[in-house]
Amino acid sequence: MAAPALGLVCGRCPELGLVLLLLLLSLLCGAAGSQEAGTGAGAGSLAGSCGCGTPQRPGAHGSSAAAHRYSREANAPGPVPGERQLAHSKMVPIPAGVFTMGTDDPQIKQDGEAPARRVTIDAFYMDAYEVSNTEFEKFVNSTGYLTEAEKFGDSFVFEGMLSEQVKTNIQQAVAAAPWWLPVKGANWRHPEGPDSTILHRPDHPVLHVSWNDAVAYCTWAGKRLPTEAEWEYSCRGGLHNRLFPWGNKLQPKGQHYANIWQGEFPVTNTGEDGFQGTAPVDAFPPNGYGLYNIVGNAWEWTSDWWTVHHSVEETLNPKGPPSGKDRVKKGGSYMCHRSYCYRYRCAARSQNTPDSSASNLGFRCAADRLPTMD
């Protein structure tokens, strides 16, 4: 039975609060759709929080004590040069440089893609790959960490990836994006619900991780989340004023460079790039800095709080506003298509609450120096 389209899902909210939140989301999504309708062919049909990206946990502020604790440890003085390096997932050096962040030709104006501004970035390191299921499992086995999706007991999953048995047990959906369903038992170990597993995809990106979960992992690994500026600088791979990490053409010489949606969304994904869901983290050619799947495949968290108002004067290692409600995510996912979610461009951006999770949301880490043993 198809799930009725409700404006919001929150099994943990009082009934009165839920009604109010439903009304608020309906108003917000309607406004977002009206704004985006006039942004041209490249614009998505829904705001990031309503359809293109990942549904948000409504007003939830899940326990982030572990993430904050790990963050404090990560900000402690680093090890001195010469100490033995940890065995860690591959990181690549990102050289210092100046680049144009954002764009003066925004495709989704309300996302705050504009204006173009010159930004200087110090040298740092970036994970060559999105954090995989295998890498995240090492973290969980070492620490006993429970993700917020596991604590809440559910997470959002794209309907097209669900079994019929799981769908029959779902009574609610997101009105603005009915292909997003809240699935009990969906988490990083069970990306499509309790009858799914990651055993056959250890090298795929870990999914259903909140911003707090990502911070906890990166800090445990001696790393951190990249800033939005670092992420976008890395995405461009040394190229200037280009849409994608490899240039301006989506498929140069007919070759696929990213895992995105082909076909009519959300009805048919033809999988012309070889995948209908996520791909292994080393799929597709790397960009000029050696980064794989920096766009498409899975959305990636950054450390910045969300804002659509950018200072053109903050030109050295910008870190975004000091506070906010949502965190910035970049890169788009396997669900993105130009007709609906043209957010697999380096300048594109979206947002989610720090405790939100879904079946297209992952991350990769950055570091000022390569992690070392204590």
Curated annotation (Swiss-Prot):
Disulfide bonds join C50-C52, C218-C365, C235-C346. Pathway: Protein modification; sulfatase oxidation. Glycans are attached at N141. N-glycosylated. Contains high-mannose-type oligosaccharides. The keyword Signal applies. Residues 1-33 form the signal peptide. Changing S333T: Reduces activity by 99%. One of its GO terms (biological process) is post-translational protein modification. Residues 341-360 are annotated as: Interaction with sulfatases. Residues 61-84 are annotated as: Disordered. InterPro entries: CTDL_fold, Sulfatase_Mod_Factor_Kinase, SUMF_dom, SUMF_sf. It is linked to Multiple sulfatase deficiency: A clinically and biochemically heterogeneous disorder caused by the simultaneous impairment of all sulfatases, due to defective post-translational modification and activation. It combines features of individual sulfatase deficiencies such as metachromatic leukodystrophy, mucopolysaccharidosis, chondrodysplasia punctata, hydrocephalus, ichthyosis, neurologic deterioration and developmental delay. Belongs to the sulfatase-modifying factor family. This is Formylglycine-generating enzyme.
